[in-house]
Amino acid sequence: MAQLPQEFLTRMQDMLGDEFDAFLTSYDAPRTAGLRVNTKKCRTEDFPPLVPGMWKKIPWIPNGYFVPDGMRMGQSPLYAAGVFYLQEPSAMTPASRLPIEPGERVLDLCAAPGGKATELNARLKGTGLLVANDISNARAKALLRNLELFGSENVLVTNETPAGLADAVSYTHLTLPTNPRV
C-alpha cells in the first residue's frame, strides 16, 4: 500500500468509520480505467465496434465503458478527435447525476481539466450556458482545450476566484462548489 500521511488516515478513519478497512484495502486493488463517450460525436452503442476490445459498460454511467487491461486509449486517434474522454469511473458520477436540464445555466467553479465540464455541456444539448471556471490559469487553458476538442458550445471559460464569481451564483440554476463540503 502507498505510504499515506497519518493526518489523512486519521481524518479518513473518522469520516468512514466501519468502512475504513475497506478503504485501505482499495489501495491494493488494481486501478480501474474508464472512458466516457462524447455523445455529441458518437452514440454510446456505436463506440465498441470502433475500437476492437472486450468493452464492458459502466453500469452507473450511461455513456461510460471500462477500459480493458492493456489498452492504451490515450494514443488513439479517436481520443485526439474528442470522441471520448479518459476518466476514472468514480469521477464520472457527479456530472452524470446532477439534476440539470437543457436550457439551464450551470456554474462549475472547479472545472479543469474538463471531465465534468464536457459531460455537463453535452447534457445541456447546445442550449443554456455552462460557465466553466478554474482558479489556475494553466488548468483553465487545459480546460479550454478539452472543451474545444469535445465540440462544446454555449460555454464560457473563466479564470477567476470563487469570490470573484459570487454574483454569478444567483444567475445560475446550479453551482458546483470548489469544495464538496460547501
Question: Residues of each region from the PLM?
Answer:
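S-adenosylmethionine
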Residues: 1-176
